[in-house]
Amino acid sequence: MQLNLAGRHALVCGASEGIGRAAAEALAGLGADVTVLARREGVLVEVAAALPRVHGSQRHGHVAADSRDGDGLRAAVSALVAQRPVQILVNNTAGPPGGTAHEAQPERYVEVFRQHLVANQILVQAVLPGMKAAGWGRIVNVISTSVKEPIPNLGVSNTVRGAVASWAKTLASELGPFGITVNNVLPGYTRTRRLEQILAERSAATGKPAEDIAKGMLATVPAGRFAEPAEVAAAIAFLASPAAAYVNGINLPVDGGRTRSL
């Protein structure tokens, strides 16, 4: 199986921790040059320095930018690609706090839509010229299993994640002729700060201990455990590899079998 990414440049968003950091490590382990993007520059410097180097010519770096600041994000990534075109883009943004859909303020929907779909669009438009010039590109969006089955009390997240999935499916058709694939990875319950946030929110809302909430969640997972970030990253790395050249426009759950829909 051809997994070698030597000579490819990957931009991984939300890479300071969790799934994003694990994805950066996985892609670097396959030989890619990796640029990590997130808000906290000090952390990014450490992450980039710790990434694997499997051959001598690998160059890793970082870009400090905030998905909530569209103009700043565009400027930062445009400066990056002017120096080093990107062939692999991993869109990965932390989810919003929980709450019901009907109680969320309209402004909240707009804010999260900008942070997720609009930021993704800015990134795609910045990297597309380099991908088209190479005749090769991979766009992988880290979303959620809520794309297939809405998750209770994550109303805004469910709505915006679904929009991102539809956007990605449209892009897959538009960009396929250029040798560019667009796919979505749908993580299930994964050991990240996001999971800790969800447990804390549900505990506060119900009065139940977070440990009991976690047990209830695990009861819905046939694998009987939470995922590790590296397991989600493995799916991302595969979709970014040459081996996945004919995989385009899919939603890939990485959830231990929890999602019941086909």
Regions from the PLM with identified roles:
Residues 9, 16-17:
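Conserved glycine-rich cofactor-binding loop
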Residues 4, 136, 223-254, 259:
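C-terminal substrate-recognition "lid" of short-chain dehydrogenase/reductases
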Residues 53-70:
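Rossmann-fold cofactor-recognition segment
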Residues 100-113, 139, 217:
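Substrate-binding pocket helix/loop in short-chain dehydrogenase/reductase
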Residues 176, 181, 247-249:
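Short, small/polar-rich loop/turn modules that mediate ligand/substrate recognition or access, typified
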Residues 140-164, 168-177, 189-190:
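Catalytic loop of short-chain dehydrogenase/reductase
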